[in-house]
Amino acid sequence: MIPIEPPKDLYTPIWEEFIEVAHESDEIVVPIGPHHAGSGHLRVTFRVKGDRIVDAIPEPGFVHRSMEKLAENKLYIQNIPLFERLAINDPANMNLAYVRAIENALGVEVPERAQYLRTILAELSRIEAFYYDAGIFSLFFGHTTGFMYCMAIREMIIEALMQISGSRSGPSFIVPGGLRRDISDDVLGLIDNMTFALHKRMKKFESIFVNNPVTIARAKGVGVLTKEDAIRCGMVGPFLRASGVNYDVRKV
């Protein structure tokens, strides 16, 4: 069997100067990617000292999925499940951005009820994605209890989304002009009741993980992103607001 040599230009070699500086400063060079155990492929080379990242060299391009090219030969409606895969943990908001672009281009007016229902769907999807991220963050800390709390919260929301669309992921429920179908009052009542249970579980998660002294000791002052850098890097969502920028695209 003849061994297959990997392409030499698969990724850029680590700079010798980068390694030398790390050794002189008693730091460790940690190359990550382009393949790793997570769901997204990336290539970053870090210089770390303890839990602190001193420097990093990112190499972008490993998660490019050619969405624009794939969409060229499809109908508008066929692209809905395609663009949901940009962030499969938050498909409703990926879909909403695409559908609104179509509506704005064609001058389509969306009924008021559909706008409200879209907002409910998008918020549920956003919270579900947030607690997935928070759960993985807890797991990285070795806090399995926090991880299980997040997954329990996420499962409640996924069950509600399944009641709406019939799908646990990739619902393709938001379409140009409104929704694929109406949401019944029974399901809306279920969501209303669920919010109270969610609030209690969220408060519990805050007490066992967010306000945990170990979490604070390990996370405080690590990876600080200033307001100026957040704006310069084009950050959005909770990352932007956590840096002190009072901006929420949902209110624009």
Task: For the regions a language model picked out, list residue spans one by one.
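Active-site bordering "gate/hinge" segments
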Residues: 1-252
